[in-house]
Amino acid sequence: MKMSKKPFVTKEQVEEIVKTYPTPFHLYDEKGIRENAKALKEAFAWNPGYKEYFAVKATPNPFLLQILKEYGCGCDCSSYTELLMSDAVGIDGHDIMFSSNDTPEEDFKLADKLGAIINLDDITHIDFLEKTIGHIPETISCRYNPGGIFKISNDIMDNPGDSKYGMTTEQITEAFKTLKAKGAKEFGIHAFLASNTVTNDYYPMLAKVLFEQAVRLQKETGVHIKFINLSGGIGIPYTPDQEPNDIRVIGEGVRKVYEEVLVPAGMGDVAIYTELGRFMMGPYGCLVTKAIHEKNTYKNYIGVDACAVNLMRPAMYGAYHHITVLGKEDAPCDHKYDVTGSLCENNDKFAIDRMLPEVDMGDYLVIH
């Protein structure tokens, strides 16, 4: 099913909402969020220990965290503030995965106080953590970076070797031995190799890399690996012609690799964790803004009342976000515009040379 270019909100609904909440604002599709969370849970139901730790950084909103909590989701936190937010909505203990890098002392102290599972990014963090909190937790995780280029068939998905995250193969082996000697009893392994992959093959391929590494680590270090965290990376379709991922196919793909690699190694008790963010929220949120100025110089500009502060991706990454002019969903896209915000930065643009229907002042634009 192709993503409709039509958003989940109508012009009439927005006209009602703006009577209470003026633009710009973010809007969420609660029904969509719930259905997706349920589908994810079902896709991994074959694994008794399965848990999704929602990547709070993706949408740090306590109301949304509470919805996901109803479906058994925990929180993947990477900062002090995210830990505070998780605690505020009643998510604590092992329902928090603290995956950070370049971590300040205060963050480790709070993670420990809340009883979070700490996922170490670097081998030097073992001593730093022990010095900071006075002990090594009994349950601990390490982040792995296999290096090199990560490919699916002939497509380069990403370049882990160029990533600042995780430990090398030698380092994670050494880390597990050291942590075991310092009293850790239950271990986890985590890796993130590619971002926003719109393919059903990414998770099963990542799973194979991690499962084989887990078998080797358990054999070489004698530790008990309790969980394997596939982190995030499952993407969403941003353009109308992209096909969305099928989470059922992905879950089944991971199950096959689990039975091929872990079960024969006597590791059929390992829990699978995920840290999806964009996949959980991306399709179910939008930014609603109003056209307030039209400027015609060397190009045609539509100025809106939102700016990069409300949605940074287009300015930061040049990322594509679909724009719908409400009430003109079926009108021909025969006008070329740059859609801009009001920041004194020339990159404050939601779209460049975008074909849209003719935009009138006062029109509501949905960026999704």
Walk through the language-model features, giving the residues of each.
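Charged (often Lys/Glu-rich) extended helix/loop segments that serve as interaction or gating elements
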Residues: 259-262, 267-368
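Short acidic, gly/pro-rich beta-turn/loop elements at beta-sheet edges
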Residues: 64, 108, 150-152, 199, ...
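A charged N-terminal "starter" segment
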Residues: 1-138, 174-181, 185, 219, ...
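Short, glycine- and charge-enriched coil/turn segments that flank and shape catalytic ligand pockets
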Residues: 46-48, 135-136, 222, 244, ...
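Active-site loop/helix belt of alpha/beta enzymes
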Residues: 132, 146-290, 356
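Structured core elements
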Residues: 74, 97, 119, 141-143, ...
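A broad detector of the eukaryotic-type serine/threonine protein kinase catalytic domain
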Residues: 19-23, 116, 194, 235, ...
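Active-site beta-loop-alpha junctions enriched in small/polar residues
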Residues: 31-32, 55-61, 78-81, 101-103, ...
